[in-house]
Amino acid sequence: GSEMCIRDRYINIHISHNDCTLSIDSSGESLHKRGYRVDQTEAPLNEVLAAGMILKTGWKGESNFVDPMCGSGTLLIEAAMIALNIAPGIHRKEFAFQKWVDYDEELFDRIYDDESGEREFAFHCYGSDISQAAIDIALENIRSAGLMKYIDLKVKPFQQYTEAPKPGILVTNPPYGERISSRDLLGLYNMIGERLKHVFMGYKAWILSYKDECFDKIGLC
């Protein structure tokens, strides 16, 4: 497959054996780039992965949402948008189809400004991180997304949690890979399990990880 651009029109060409498929790209920049992210921490969570993870939990805003290792705030922002039923691409600056000859700007503006599908969010999203720099970045992204009213942030290590808002769900993406040693990683998950057992009673917890031994350290199964 290949891609070419002719006067702002992106054409995808895919050749397989004797078949050739031509398609016009109506999106432009990848749709996983929502448009609200103005800065990011090291190894930020992909926006689509964050949204998919939240949707997998079944949560749609019927309780508080907590991310105690929030980094640049992606899970918090996607959670608030899901709770409010805000269209995920609403913050994008442009789409490729806006440069098409038959682009209907009036129709696009009418659809873009239609908020009839949005809903109230009676609870709140709470985020924290051990890093002041991460919280500063998350704050900028949340402000860019226009969600300051729905998300609370603070600099706070997970192990310092002594209470949790009720009712609630916890969804988080702990540090991994080169950012943390194997020994510290297992210690981190042991601490996560301890906090879940003593502070987040009654919660459902969804944690993104890549090692089964990490979940073993949580010790809830």
PLM segments and residue spans:
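Class I S-adenosyl-L-methionine
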Residues: H14-K56
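Conserved Class I SAM-dependent methyltransferase catalytic core
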Residues: A122-H124, S128, Q132-D136, T162, ...
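Short, small-residue-biased leader/transition segments that mark boundaries at the very start
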Residues: G1-I6
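Conserved S-adenosyl-L-methionine
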Residues: L45, L49-T162, E178
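A short, flexible beta-alpha/helix-coil linker loop
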Residues: E29-S30, P175-R179
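Glycine/charge-rich, flexible interdomain linkers and switch-proximal surface loops
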Residues: R7-I15
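Hydrophobic beta-strand segment of the Class I
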Residues: L170-V171
